[in-house]
């Protein structure tokens, strides 16, 4: 039998209005507790670029927006077997704008998360820091371990260092990738603007290149002696795929983007391109329009479990930290303003986080 505090029947949440607009509603149902999930009372949420891009056919009117969140567990499903308990401080990535589970988004007073994809927050980490981890962690692990399948893992570091390029190392996913790769014993190369060189080095970058330099790709190729096999593109624009493709060595390799990439620029046959969709981590597939639509794939969820166990250990040991954050108060009402700030491109090098009272 599950354990839970007495939960209200309704809550305040940010949902999609009839025209797909962000709408603050005070009578949104609280999601029923599933057997293998937990419900937390939200303490903080973080914004991601994807939050501003869900429009048109991505929208399900009445569904809750938002992905990254942190809070305190108030309900535990009867089949939760990983020791999570009421009162635990936790974080994760929720099911934002999900057609099949419209009450699953993060921008709400109460959020349900799969227990095996939920992380306990270490005592030294704040709710605000923890709220910023979810999507970046998922994207990093999906890119490296399940799509590229690099010859290293969080549990078994590389026997011999090999280079991996992270294009856009100063992004939230970029700094997470750098940390994860460093733990895996990998030689980390990244691109960013010179003003962020010190930032990416502090997150584990071994070598940093100015993406504005006309010789950026050539410099990376020379630094890796024409042997670079792996590139993760956190930006995914025409110019970024060109640099990544030019930087990968003569023998080819893999290029992974965080968004659908421009296929006409995937010009080298010796390079295997691909892209990831972080929301697939649950194994439940995606009802979003093409090219984002996916059928359920339980294997993804099965692969995620050991990775999450390894990540939990690293968090407990203080070996993973959040991207620089800009913390705002005001709860859900203020999140609406944050979405506009993000949409206008008025924040750089930081992740917007909103704390609840």
Swiss-Prot record:
InterPro entries hit by this protein: ADH-like_C, ADH-like_N, GroES-like_sf, NAD(P)-bd_dom_sf, PKS_ER, Trans-enoyl_RdTase-like
Binding site for NADP(+): 50-53, 170-173, 193-196, 211, 258-259, 347-348
GO MF annotation, one: nucleotide binding
One Pfam family in the UniProt entry: ADH_zinc_N
Thylakoid is among the record's keywords: no
This enzyme's EC code(s): 1.-.-.-
Key words, A-Z: Antibiotic biosynthesis, NADP, Nucleotide-binding, Oxidoreductase
Complex formation: Monomer.
Family under the similarity heading: Belongs to the zinc-containing alcohol dehydrogenase family.
PANTHER family documented for this protein: HYPOTHETICAL OXIDOREDUCTASE (EUROFUNG) (PTHR45348), ZINC-TYPE ALCOHOL DEHYDROGENASE-LIKE PROTEIN C2E1P3.01 (PTHR45348:SF2)
Name used for this protein in its record: Trans-enoyl reductase buaC
Protein's organism: Petromyces alliaceus
Organism phylogeny: Eukaryota, Fungi, Dikarya, Ascomycota, Pezizomycotina
Gene: buaC
